[in-house]
Amino acid sequence: MTHRTPNFRRFHLFLPLFLKGMIFLLLHFKFLVIFALELPIISLRPKSDCFLFWKCTTDYRIQKNQKIGKFVELTEGQTLSLQCAYRRGTPKFTYPNFLAERVEQEFSEPLNTDYVRIEDIRESDTGSFSCNSTENPAQSDSIHVFVHKSKIFLPSKSVFSKKDLWNELTVPCKTTKLTESKEIELYADGKLVASQDFDPRHGFRITRKGYAAQPSFFECKFNKKNKTQSVDFIISKNEPIDNEYILFWEDSFPFPHVGYNFSLTCHLVYIEPNGNAPKLGELAFECPQCQSRLDNHLVIEKHHNVGRKRLSSAIHIKNLQLRDAGKYRCIWKKTGKARQEIEHSLHVSPTIAQVRILEQSPSFLKAKAGSGSVKLYAKFAVYPAGNYTVTWRRTYNSIEGPRDEIVEKGLSATFLENSESMEVLDITDLSCNKSGKYLLSINYQDTSETIFWEVAVESDYPDVQLIIREPASFKVFGHQFYLLGTHLNIDCVSTSIPLVDALLEYRKENFKIFTKVSRSFVADGTFERKISYQVVLTENMMLKCRVGNRVALETVHVADEIPNIKFKLASNKSAIYEGDTVKLTCVVPKLAGRCSITWVHRNLSILHSTEVTEHSQLSFLYIRNATTSASGNYTCVLENQASENFSLSTILKVEPIIAPYIVKTGFSAPTGSKLDCNIDGRPPPEYQWFKDGTPYGTGRRLKFFEEDNSGIYQCLATNRAGSATNSFELKTAGRSYGIFVLLAILALGILVILGWKISTKLGWKKNRDLKLLYKSLIGSENFLPNGKNQFSNFNFEFHKDSLEILEPIGSGHFGVVRRGILKGTKTVVAVKSSSYRSSIGFQKVIVEELKLMSAIPKHPNVLALVGAITKNLRHGELYILMEYIDGGNLRDFLQQRRNVFIDELHDNFDENIPLIRPDFNSLSTTDLVGIAHQIANGMEWLGNVPCVHGNLCCRKVLISKTKTIRITDYGVGDRQRKSSSMRWMAPEAIEHQMFSSKSDVWSFGICLYEIFTLGGTPYPTCVTENILKHIKNGSRNLQPEYCPSALYDLMQLCWRAPPQDRPKFSLCSELIEKQLKDLTISF
């Protein structure tokens, strides 16, 4: 017993200690497990007294990087949990300054473990977390936490002082994700300075030596898979307001809209290691509704010293309204004075559906032609998420006017993370003509956003182009020919950025030296500059458009007339009959080198004679005593030395002759005061009338010249095949009037029947008339007055589906004019149609106008026909497509610029004002003379057609934005003595309705009066009813204030009473051109 007692006592003493130890182990089992798991790590780092555990609410894992060590990547909103365990000593956990008020920290004495937990982690929480031993600060472990939302760069102080730069400067473009060095680039004053030594925890470090160039602006750029972001930093010459904190905004919702409860928080965060929030300071707000705060609509919540290094204040807005939009300023004040402020623009959408632009490539881009490609991109988000449509467009100014074209259109499918999207336009094959304003329109539900870019593609070598705007030309063997005396309108166009002037020169045939041509006006586009010239063609010449060493050449040849074959008969007949002698003349232009002409009929060559004039070659073919076998196709073939052929053909038809024969025995019943011979023949016979054996008259129909027409009448018809006679006795004495009563009854019955037919078949007749009208349009060859015809076929037809008709832009008595767009070419046109589609009379007026316009050759000062839609004319649809002139009519143009008019005739003229003013809103004396010269040129062209305008006035003249005029409504005006037109009409037109080119000259003189009175009314002191009397008394309009004396002398010449004493338009043009040159030289 004595031997066991000591042992039992020892066990009794040890048992309580053993039980306490077991309980301790059970309570801290999990820490032992963790400790056991980390023992290998500790063993790898035997000198470390602490080690770091971490875990997250998701399955993210710890990763390692050679440069930054251990790290983890999280997404904003997740929860971060960290554990720091020590073998001995008191733990110390350090973390980024931003986290002081949101960290849940707990320390457990067993195993010396410190816990850190952060819920709803934010992008701004990115930073390094470290575990340190208080006894041995050198012993530590750390991990870097990246928290990403949408931006790749963390907010940071953006202004640094030169004082900050001592041995080195850190540009703190820290990232929220681990990035590779080559993905981040550093630019100093726009130049790339670093791309390799980037640390995502700190940014770029620049030594004092690297700062030798002393840049003032740094930019960090992130580029990866069409995703680009950047952040800027400024080096200030002045001392910063404060260099230990940053000020930034945080909003609660990226898509604020009407009705939403919105919050906006301003944070002041101290970033220096020893920086503390000051005790005497506050964050103040300025905003659209900050002063009113009605009904608790807007509440400001202030939090001072939230944590040691942070101040925060928030604005809460209930039921957001449009009036809440605007600038919100957060002002950091210390001791009552503002030290720094930051601004936030709040955009409140009226609808829930929104398109928010997040990022875009630079809005102004310059590139070199041929350098590759330019990418335009925009990053944006739509709310709520859904499909949207986008349209890429380009607008630019061409030398002919504004252009708007669709580059790309469709449903987007480019989606990024966080419900964001990106659109990219790759502009390849760079050249100057790819320049302009590019627009991206994003359409989503009932809202849209548009983004703009300016793209300028510069070229070291401008392109040049020579354009001759003269449609009355033709080609033979590739040579361009124009008629002698043609007024050539030549455009010398240079394509480049920046714009440069092109020079036009010409060289006459057999001359070696080029001569410079004086330019008339300049028109600029986005990447084109057009310099226009006018040349009267008198002989063959070579034209050269030149910019430096870049040259465009064009050889212009003169011809007396367009190649053609003419008929000439020995006798004056409209057809060719057996026995006639026919002369065929083939007219072709004179060509350099040796050329031969051959006539071919039924594959056989025919003998002919030739003649050469200064500008033409003529070949004559005579067919004597023609027979019907001579009918057929005759071809004139021109062959050059290269064995190339140019041919013209015509069809000759020889009619057989027929002796005169009686169509109807005896005379037809008298029709009014005429009798018909009723004898026909081929060729048409000559007729001789006899009364009672005495010659009485000629012609097929005989007119009565006596009241008593009784007698025996004979008609003798004779042609080359023979003759025939028809006779009849006419008695008029004692005639009964019963026949007239019978005829009256018969006529009344016919009228009743016709009335019934008209009332029952009105629709049929209208359709028939419209069909006949259409046939007359297609088949008519008498387009022009005086029988002159330019075109035999109507070849301007467009399909109605190719035209989009828009808003009305004008109207007249017979028609209405609307703006339209040709869908294929996006060309803007003016569309004219009848005011009443069901009116045959109105449609006929439009048809006649179309016929005339289609036959008038184009001229830069005469409104040109673009085309027509006639296929549905049978159903009352007829549209004339004309040039669209964007400046309106000349009278309104002049009246609207009276306040800005520059009178260059007086001494107070400012010599610094340029003579050439392309601005459409400006107006000067030189402009007025130039406009008058253009009208004279246009009217001279119409007079040479010939075509009488009949209603010339400034209302009938259109003007473009480049101050080029077009004469309109020519030849189809309502030539009636109307009060609205009498002030412009010549006296013979008012009194006798006599219209001619001379009456147009009178109206041109009135136009000059309108121009130099800036849209004034002619005869301002005379009532309309007395105009004719006023003119006959010798009264004329007085000289306008702004009119040069030489041009008033021209007006008086135009207003001479005898029409033959008035000048031709060619003289008017010449006199005005001289005045224009004198005016230019004088200034």
Swiss-Prot record:
Known glycosylation sites: N132, N226, N261, N387, N433, N572, N603, N625, N633, N645
Keyword Flavoprotein among record annotations: no
Induction data: By high temperatures.
Residue intervals annotated with topology Cytoplasmic: 757-1083
SUPFAM superfamilies, sorted: Immunoglobulin, Protein kinase-like (PK-like)
GO molecular function, a single term: transmembrane receptor protein tyrosine kinase activity
Membrane topology qualifier: Single-pass type I membrane protein
Cell compartment(s), UniProt: Cell membrane
Positions contributing to ATP binding: I809, G810, S811, G812, H813, F814, G815, V816, V817, K832
GO biological process: cell surface receptor protein tyrosine kinase signaling pathway; nematode male tail tip morphogenesis
Expressing tissues: Expressed in amphid and phasmid sheath cells, the muscular intestinal cell and the first and last intestinal cells. Expression in amphid and phasmid sheath cells is increased in dauer animals.
Domain of life: Eukaryota
TM helices/strands, residue ranges: 736-756
Domain Protein kinase: 803-1076
Cellular component, GO annotation: plasma membrane; receptor complex
Ig-like C2-type domain location: 563-647, 656-731
Residue ranges that the UniProt entry lists as topological domain Extracellular: 1-735
Gene3D superfamilies found in the cross-reference section: Immunoglobulins, Transferase(Phosphotransferase) domain 1
Known function: Involved in amphid glia remodeling during entry into dauer stage by promoting the fusion of sheath amphid cells which encloses AWC neuron sensory endings. May be involved, downstream of pvf-1, in the positioning of ray 1, the most anterior ray sensillum in the male tail.
Record remark on domains: The protein kinase domain is predicted to be catalytically inactive.
Protein family: Belongs to the protein kinase superfamily. Tyr protein kinase family.
Protein name (Swiss-Prot/TrEMBL): Protein ver-1
Taxonomy of the source species: Eukaryota, Metazoa, Ecdysozoa, Nematoda, Chromadorea
